[in-house]
Amino acid sequence: MITLIVGTNRPGSNTRKVAAQLEEIYAGLKVPLQVLDLAKLPQEIFSPTSYAEKPKSFLPFADAILKSDGLHVVTPEYNGSVPGVLKYFIDMLKFPESFEQKPVCFTGLAAGIWGALRPVEQLQAIFGYRNAHLFPVRVFMPQINNLLDASGKIKDAELLARLKSQVEGFAKFVEKIKA
């Protein structure tokens, strides 16, 4: 099963809207998927004592990562970087087993012209350090507000085709690594 990580905890985020479209693509391809939305992280995880002892309410999130065959991270760009909650989530996971030899795919979006290039590259460095297998096909969505319609759906057919191609390729990548 692939885990789709919604890389922000911002309510009503464009990241969540894009993740919903990726869910539809995975479902259409009949690829088993679970969604891990960082907006649903338990509040007690943000206590300084959580580094030493993880709250029991965090275990389902940590277990989802450990049991996943691959991770598809959807990240926005906040201040030229990865959202703090996404980095914190990564830091809270078990080391090294959470990402060791795990396939990881990245989709980035931003209001600006670079489409989250910086945070995706930062995440590639982090996951590479953690010995993950980085899927080389990344999709960047610059000026995201121009790419979504009033209902939050991606209105650009070429972009949807790129996302579908990314998902198809990543699903094959995960299967090859599992084999």
Question: How would you name each of these model-derived features?
Answer:
Residues 1-95, 153-179:
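N-terminal beta1-alpha1-beta2 submodule of the flavodoxin-like/Rossmannoid cofactor-binding fold
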Residues 2, 7, 79, 103, ...:
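Short, flexible coil/turn micro-motifs enriched in small/turn-prone residues
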Residues 34-45, 95-97, 130-150:
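Mobile beta-alpha loop/short-helix "lid" or hinge segments that flank ligand
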Residues 103-143, 158:
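Short, glycine-/small-residue-rich phosphate/pyrophosphate-handling segment
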